[in-house]
Amino acid sequence: KACPRNCDTDIAYMVCPSSGERIIRKVCTNCCAAQKGCKLFRSNGSIKCTGT
């Protein structure tokens, strides 16, 4: 799928299966471009989306 490469400033951190579920901060991604299974979170801790 084609995804824009822009950073979603609403995303504070993400957690991915490939990182062993560790929190990854300072991410520059968006809901479309995130790796499969990665969960993207807002700064208040709510989940914004999961990569598909």
Curated annotation (Swiss-Prot):
The keyword Disulfide bond applies. Disulfide bonds join C3-C32, C7-C28, C16-C38, C31-C49. It comes from the Eukaryota. Keywords: Disulfide bond, Protease inhibitor, Serine protease inhibitor. One of its GO terms (molecular function) is serine-type endopeptidase inhibitor activity. The keyword Disulfide bond applies. Belongs to the protease inhibitor I20 (potato type II proteinase inhibitor) family. Potent inhibitor of trypsin and a weaker inhibitor of chymotrypsin. It does not inhibit elastase and subtilisin DY. This is Proteinase inhibitor PSI-1.2.
